[in-house]
Amino acid sequence: MRQVSEFLRQAVEPKRLYTVVKEVSSYHRIQASTGFRKAANYCKETLDQLGIESRIISYKASPDVWYLQNKMFMEWDLKNAWLKLNDYDVMLCDAQTEPISIIQKSYPVDFTSGVELVYLSKGNNPEEYKDIDLKGKVIFVRDAFNGYVNWAVKEKGAIGIVTDFMRTVPGIRTRNDLYESMNYTSFWWTHEEDEPKTFGFVLSPKMGDWLAEQCTKQMKAYERKEKDTPYLKVSGKVDSRLYPGEIEVVEAVLPGETEEAVLISAHLCHPKCSCNDNASGVSASIEVLRSLKSLMDAGKLARNKRTIKVILMPEFTGTYAYLSESEHLKNVMGAINLDMVGGKQTRFYGPITGTSLPNSTPSFINDLTSLCMDYAAEEAPNLSGKMVSKTNYTFEFFSGGSDHVVFSDPTVGIPCCMLGQWPDLNYHTATDTLDVIDPEVLAFSCRTAALFVYTLANLNENHIREIQNKAHVNLSKRLAETAQHVLDGKLKAEQISHQLRHIKQYFTQSAEDYKRVYDIEDALIEKEKQWISTAVDQMMNYLDVEETELKVQDDRVFERTYVGPVNSLVDCVTRYPQSKHLYETYQQKMKTMGMGAHTLEALMQFYLDGKRTVSEIAQCIQCDTLMECHDVVSAFVELLESMRLSVQK
């Protein structure tokens, strides 16, 4: 593996990576849009020029279509959009200059004759505005706009929304950190009959503060009877269309000798610019294929035995569509997802982070991914000649947020780690621009992915021994973390044995996973399992752990009736309106879970295998996350059952 890594260090071209990021980021790549289609065509043309076999697969984009557990939506085409403050003759938004200045998927509207702008200065509380007439007016709000759609637009008749909301992230960014940027916002329409057809515009915090000041001045002047109206006037237009259309998935292939395949995924979507998120992942994926092909063509590397595939798709949406065709589920041995992999590691930009598999999907793919990161990190010699990393990187426990979640669902069965980057100061904003990209960091991510797919495509016993050695390191780390949790008081005494058994089971099953992809001798697997058992038993003795039995509070066993995780429970509830009260109960319980809620929802589905009781599922998740969640799990399985997504055994 080290020799292959060295070849890749020479073959991967940072300048080429940077150029592709630049080109991809020039397209406004909203899911199911003409701009996304143009970006997909660019990627296809680039692959063609490199002599790499590729195709574009199209799928229907219409609200009556479901792919696995993901409901589709209309295609959106934006020609132009602008918003002007008439009283000051100031252009507030211009989508041709900055496409993020419109709330994506806005419906068409023409109010060039002017309408009143109502500043809702008291936040999202309908009671504060019960005496204010919003009919036919545009509202100006300072917080997340979504909560205003139902009451201000649907009930009180506002026609549109202006917002200067900037998502803050504790410890990473405040509103003032991105004072002149704009938040990436979008409507995610369900296209139900009673859904309002509205539009919206986005301001920077700086422009929003100025507009709020002018609105307040106008109101005070009106109260002093110096103005005829309490409201300023705005005019504007949104020239857009929503209609049944298509989404595209770009698939590229380095053919192998067998029908088995390994996969790289990277989402191609997001607004114009959006360089780290995720033009970086797209660029790295293309460069993986180019660099491997060039090395194989030059005779430096042997041809890949398994087929190597890349898919570039709309995030989640394209993955569900792609996997809905069973041919894409067959014979995929493993995958790696690239999402935000090239940001300059300066202020508020974190390490390149490998996100591990969930423990519900045990596989050696975890250890292979982290080992590939180590090899890619051999970038430059230190003063004693040892190769060390110029790139900050880490490997962390499973969390959600990107397409690896779909692949790693046990019902899909494609073990997939992710390379990402967090923190990212400019995440989902207008300032995720080309200047945040570091070609050398991006090259590190590219080399990691290239080594991963090439090794898995040609896996042999020598590789397995290297990966097993890395598994020993990773197991030792997990055991040390458990000991630290005990010291920190994060694990109760009765929980420690459950935690260690959980770790032992995961690593044991991961050791057995080699049989899935290689005809390995049983003796080598048994030796590895014995090493794992001994290591865990030693930690049990070190911590003076007494075996404890699980206290079963709920012995019900449920089995899923669907493939792939549910993408939106809201969409599922629209199919089963009688489940709304159970959904609301579940949501109330989930609020107590904080930032881990998204990951928790995935894990609950992954452990729902028709064998574990509700209490056992809650115990597994507590071992994974240290979150006590029994009540949440109970509420969740009852909600799924009411929507016929699970059955009690």
Map each language-model feature to its residues.
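Noncatalytic luminal/extracellular "stalk/propeptide" segments of secretory-pathway proteins
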Residues: R2, A11-K15, T19-K135
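Metal-dependent peptidase/peptidase-like ectodomains
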Residues: S5, A11-V12, V90, S186-E193, ...
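Charged, amphipathic alpha-helical linkers/stalks
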Residues: D438-D513
